[in-house]
Design a protein with these regions (language model features):
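Phospho-regulatory, Ser/Thr- and acidic-rich intrinsically disordered linkers and terminal tails
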Residues: 3-194
Length: 194
């Protein structure tokens, strides 16, 4: 098979590269999306705990970068696009902590190797799963999300912002967060016939 990447055509030189190209080809049933967790130049303990726990929920479809990276997602996204393409990942979380924006997570979605959207959120508190005396989630399990309130509703009937009392820009951010989290932790598609 020949892979068309914009203008260049890459042919596999050996069996290993052929298998790698076949793995990236379009499929009838797509695999779960892979996520990359990247630490910025400075991260606080809160951000480190949050990223570790989010990556644990995403396993086995999570790649955690160990080294710190000088990355500013909103200023230059080329490194994010490179990492996504190199690791065959379409989701990234970049953790950082700066003086003006402490304890931040930047969620990034890629489509076709390009940044589709980004959402920046602050971390107020982070607690490790080890602090809770319960069973830990198994690998590959999906978390349960409950979105409550008028900010998360997208029904046109109830989308009257004046009646809901929600700010239109804030409501858009809440809907964006809902979409991103559900896409991020969607997991493996299950076959309805089995």
């Amino acid at each position: 098979p020949v892979v068309h990447d914009m203008l260049r055509v890459a042919k596999p030189k050996n069996a290993r590269s052929k298998r790698a190209l076949e793995k990236r080809e379009s499929k009838e049933k797509e695999n779960a999306k892979t996520a990359i967790f990247v630490r910025g130049t400075r991260t606080s303990e809160k951000v480190n705990v949050a990223m570790t726990e989010l990556a644990a929920l995403k396993k086995p479809d999570a790649v955690a970068f160990n080294k710190r990276n000088d990355v500013l997602p909103f200023e230059d996204a080329t490194s994010l696009e490179f990492w996504g393409q190199k690791n065959d990942a379409s989701l990234l979380v970049v953790g950082s902590s700066q003086k003006k924006r402490p304890d931040n997570l930047c969620w990034v979605r890629l489509f076709d190797g390009q940044v589709l959207d980004m959402l920046e959120m602050g971390v107020l508190e982070a607690t490790s799963m080890n602090a809770f005396k319960t069973n830990k989630p198994g690998i590959g399990m999906r978390p349960l999300f409950h979105f409550s309130g008028p900010e998360f509703e997208s029904d046109p009937e109830t989308d009257r912002l004046g009646a809901a009392g929600a700010d239109p820009e804030a409501k858009g951010a809440f809907l964006h967060l809902k979409s991103l989290l559900l896409d991020f932790y969607r997991g493996e598609e299950l076959d309805p016939n089995h």
